[in-house]
């Protein structure tokens, strides 16, 4: 209900197309329990939900294997997600760098590409 309320509120105020909503965690969860105390982290299969300005609604990109263990169809990296978010915000992700150990690094590394399937 909170996300639906946010979207409804943004639309009623005419702000939905000016806001990018990003919902995701820093990792997924394994589809099975490794121990009796719950499921462990899974960096090979996780979900991201995007809405608002610049996003084509109702689009699904990629899928996990039949067990939900790892991305199997059209996998995307976190670098690609970051590149897409920065692109929608109007920033050139290839020029955004930071200095680390005397070397300029890109925020999206060399793997960052815009996920064009989600763009409106």
Labelled PLM ranges:
Residues 1-120:
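Ligand-binding pockets and gating/stacking loops
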């Amino acid at each position: 209900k909170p996300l639906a309320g946010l979207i409804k509120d943004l639309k009623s105020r005419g702000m939905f197309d000016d806001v990018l909503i990003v919902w995701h965690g820093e990792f997924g969860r394994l589809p099975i329990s490794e121990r009796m105390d719950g499921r462990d982290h899974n960096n090979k299969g996780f979900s991201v939900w995007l809405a608002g300005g610049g996003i084509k609604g109702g689009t699904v990109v990629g899928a996990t294997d039949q067990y939900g263990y790892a991305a199997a169809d059209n996998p995307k990296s976190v670098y690609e997600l970051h590149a897409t978010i920065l692109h929608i915000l109007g920033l050139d992700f290839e020029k955004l760098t930071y200095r680390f150990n005397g070397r300029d690094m890109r925020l999206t590394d060399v793997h960052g590409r815009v996920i064009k399937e989600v763009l409106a």
